[in-house]
Each structure stands twice: as C-alpha cells, then as structure tokens.
Amino acid sequence: MAKKIFYTSEARDKVLSGAKQLYDAVKVTFGPKGQNVVIEKSYGAPTITHDGVTVAEAVELPSDEENLGEAIGAKLIKTAAQKLNKVAGDGTTTVTVLTYNILAEANKLIAAGVNPMELRKGIEDAGAEIIKGIEKSAEKIEGNDSKVAEVASISAG
C-alpha cells in the first residue's frame, strides 16, 4: 500500500485540527478544579474521569485517507501525554495543553515564513533553558516524608 504524504499549509492545518480535537477533550481536566469527562465505551458502563491521559487515550479519530492528517495530529498530542505518564505518572493534561499550544504557535510562525528547522532549534533551546531553571529552583524532598506526602496529596487532587 502506498504511503500518504502530507505537505503544505493544508497538511499543517489538518494536523493542527486533529491536535485541537484531542486538546479540547483533555484541557477541561486541567488543575485541581478540572472537570470530569464521561467516556462512552462499546461495552459496559461509561467511565467518568478527570485524568488527562485516560481522556487522551479514549479519543479516537478516523484514520482513513481523508482524515489521516487529523488522526496524526491527535496522535502527536496523545503520544506526548502517554510518554509523560509513563515517566512521571502525572502532568499529562499540562503536557497536552503545552504541546498543543506550541504546535499552534509554530504553525502560525511557519505560515508567516519562519524556517521550520530554525523554529525547532529555538524550541529545543528554550526547553533546555526551562529545564535549567527548574533544576535550579527544585527542592529536594527525598527522605522528607512530610514533603513527599504533601506533593503526593497535591498530585492526587
């Protein structure tokens, strides 16, 4: 089977559209006051959750030729959430919101003529600076049971 190759602004718009569909479903779960989402399944009772990765994994877009770009966009965001969940176990809604917004802004910049490779380098450089800042301001909690419990309580919602 031949592979479908997307390019130009039409392709970017399709990818962004799929990413936005997943983003819209997940963003409502953001933060301690995040809303619940009802997920209908083909079997059993619906699932009610405010867990971003659970919502992301439930979003399924058609991947036929006409909708492939949208399916790819949703998969980009879903993959970021799944990877973070595997590594950190939390923050999946945050990574969904950040990833979608970076993608949306990058799409605007590329449409305005910014070189995509230079844009990628800028995003990677900014990410490295953010990591340095977080590491600098991070507080070690290993061995401090009350701090560990406090962080776990915040994370649990």
Can you say where each PLM-predicted feature lies in the sequence?
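N-terminal glycine-/lysine-enriched basic segments
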Residues: 1-157
